[in-house]
A protein has these predicted regions:
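Sec-dependent N-terminal signal peptides
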Residues: 1-7
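C-terminal motif of bacterial Sec signal peptides marking the signal peptidase cleavage site
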Residues: 12-15
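Bacterial signal peptide processing site
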Residues: 17-19
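Mature, Sec-exported extracytoplasmic domains of Gram-positive
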Residues: 23-192
Length: 192
């Protein structure tokens, strides 16, 4: 009985088999995660591509939908807007319609769960677009950048599709094949 009592006492003092180093590192890891979450990155209105890339590089390599939403980023997950994202998107569109300079970051996830960030700013009526695929393990291009003159919204076949384009007369059918076009890029496609 005395041996059992001593064993229980020893285990309780050692943190159930964890060393002091393990306990300290677990506390440090938890604090670091909380601190990272508290570091909200301001989405600035930019038109220079090197500045946009620098801004996007500030976001962590691994981002959950919750982390992304906390950062004020529009989250598209499973063909739907994430929590609070539709409100952010609608505010961006309102600013564009009101001819106010504005910017937004959109995050969509690959099949493997890797985040792809899209930065869009509207400055003096032009759209500056940078896609950041640096977090995509299987991505071939790390950054893609374009400038566009127009945005188009299509509501058809149960989908809400937003694109940036150089062609203001682009039809819905043509917009479905934007990957092959050099004059447009799809920002988001969500189920209505």
């Amino acid at each position: 009985i005395l041996g059992t009592a001593m064993l229980l006492t020893a285990v309780s003092f050692t943190g159930c088999g964890r060393s002091v180093k393990d306990s300290t590192s677990a506390k440090t890891e938890k604090t670091t995660k909380e601190t990272k979450r508290d570091e909200k990155i301001e989405i600035k209105i930019l038109s220079k591509y090197d500045q946009i890339k620098k801004l996007l590089s500030k976001y962590p390599k691994e981002m959950t939908a919750e982390d992304t939403s906390y950062q004020g980023i529009v989250v598209i997950e499973y063909d739907s807007f994430g929590k609070g994202s539709k409100k952010l998107w609608n505010q961006f569109l309102k600013n564009v319609k009101d001819h106010k300079d504005c910017a937004i970051v959109i995050c969509q996830y690959t099949v493997e769960g890797d985040p792809i960030l899209q930065y869009v700013s509207n400055v003096n009526g032009k759209f500056y677009y940078v896609e950041d695929s640096t977090r995509d393990a299987y991505g071939s291009e790390k950054y893609v950048q374009y400038t566009y003159d127009y945005y188009k919204i299509y509501k058809q076949d149960g989908h809400y599709t937003a694109i940036l384009t150089m062609d203001n007369k682009l039809t819905f059918d043509e917009a479905q094949d934007v990957r092959s076009l050099k004059t447009a890029i799809q920002l988001l496609d969500v189920k209505q």
